[in-house]
Amino acid sequence: MSAAKPKVAKKARVAPAHPPSSQMVVAAVTALKERGGSSTQAIKKYIAANYTVDMTKQGPFIRRALVKGVASGALVQTKGKGASGSFKLGKKKEGKSDAQKARIAAKKAKLAAKKKEQREKKALKTKARKEKVAAKKAAKKATKKTKKVKKPAAKKAKKPAAKKPAAKKPAAKKAKKPAKKVAKPAKKAAAKPAKKAAKPAKKAAKPAKKAAKPAKK
């Protein structure tokens, strides 16, 4: 087995001898209180006098802190450009009061409600338009269906109407034929007995002629 390696004691982190460069720059400008702004040289002197720093090494960090301070609004550059010139503290943005916050919140809520109302109205209009179009389409379909249904109904109604008058003709013929048949036997029955009654009368006359012959002798 290999021997356990001895644990190396971690070096205690050395606390920095000075705060960050941005804090030192702001502290210097605040303490100097120059009306026209504090120069870069004056700020460096204040930091060197009040903090334990190596100005040779810290110089670039101070210049960077000045540029960043102007960009963020913590500092205002009154003269010069970049890290050179004069600097003073920027105006602190005052926190909005509760009344202002309430007004802003109410304004936002009102705008949101208005937008919502507009969206709802728009949605209702589009819905109504769609319903109207759908109703028109449905009405057109209904009219087409009714037209299709009406055509067969008209044909069916016409055919039975034409057949009904034809049914009346057989009824009229049946009534006339029996009347003719009844009339013919009546004529024959009346005529035949009359002829038969006349024949015996002729036969009765013949004997009278025979009786006259003896008178000639």
Swiss-Prot record:
It is found in: Nucleus; Chromosome. Residues 1-21, 80-217 are annotated as: Disordered. GO terms for molecular function: double-stranded DNA binding; nucleosomal DNA binding; structural constituent of chromatin. The keyword DNA-binding applies. Residues 114-123 have a biased composition (Basic and acidic residues). Residues 17-91 form the H15 domain. Residues 104-113, 124-217 have a biased composition (Basic residues). Keywords: Chromosome, DNA-binding, Nucleus. This is Histone H1-gamma, late. It comes from Strongylocentrotus purpuratus.
